[in-house]
Amino acid sequence: MAAPIGRTLLGVAKGWRQLDRLWAGSSRGLSLEAAPSSSRSPWRLSGALCLQRPPLITKPLTPLQEEMAGLLQQVEVERSLYSDHELRALDEAQRLAKKKADLYDEEQDQDVTLAQDLEDMWEQEFLQFRPGARETEADKKNDRTSLHRKLDRNLILLVREKLGDQDLWMLPQVEWQPGETLRGTAERILATLSENNMEAKFLGNAPCGHYKFKFPKAIRTESDLGVKVFFFKALLLTGDFVQTGKKGRHVWASKEELGDYLQPKYLAQVRRFLLDL
């Protein structure tokens, strides 16, 4: 009886030793596979800010839109109920008819402003009203550094930065720092631009696009190939961007004007996440 039990225990012990050897081997394999991941990537990480000024006025209507708007306005007038002012005008018309028929007490008319008097007053105020011009002084001068241009379009902030021996236009960007999120990097960009107290609303925590570029050959190495840039969108709420002593180093460009500044490959990636509704 003791012999079978001893053989069983001996088999269990051998099984544990084999399992231990397999576990040790797999641990060494895992440590060897994990070792390369601890080495530094040859690509730097950066966050970029796509800061947009939304439209301040609506776009002009096309002829088809004007025709449709007129049709809808006509339908609205025909199907709508009378307003308080219209009911008052109808009541005054009835009283005027009674007055002509000598069935109306004139004492009820004392110190009462008629609806027609109000309409005449409103008409005078309307004639004195002058709407603001759709075309600003910056539009006339084609001053793209001004935020007060193309009021019916989205405008995007571009800055001119020196990369190696080249001056390139791009969205504002800074290098990612260990310990911060990529959105935190984008928020840090806004903080550096906020000398003029700009406030903006970020649209989400995830990047809306990315771009990868290599450094110029003069500064490129095997351990430092280039930069991977992650874009974050934000809408400008208040403030303006002014660079003291750096005239011509920034522009507020519309979507159609981006091609005048950005490199083709960079522009292709930026246009993928831009919507101009």
UniProtKB/Swiss-Prot annotation:
GO molecular function: structural constituent of ribosome
Annotated positions of the N6-succinyllysine modification: K217, K246
Pfam families: MRP-L46 (PF11788)
GO cellular component, one term: mitochondrial large ribosomal subunit
Keyword vocabulary terms for this entry: Acetylation, Mitochondrion, Ribonucleoprotein, Ribosomal protein, Transit peptide
Signal peptide: none
Modification N6-acetyllysine occurs at: K228
InterPro entries referenced in this protein's UniProt entry, alphabetically: NUDIX_hydrolase-like_dom_sf, Ribosomal_mL46, Ribosomal_mL46_N, Ribosomal_mL46_NUDIX
Coiled-coil regions, chain positions: none
Compartments (UniProt record): Mitochondrion
Quaternary data: Component of the mitochondrial ribosome large subunit (39S) which comprises a 16S rRNA and about 50 distinct proteins.
Recorded family membership: Belongs to the mitochondrion-specific ribosomal protein mL46 family.
Protein name as annotated: Large ribosomal subunit protein mL46
Organism field: Rattus norvegicus (Rat)
Encoding gene per record: Mrpl46
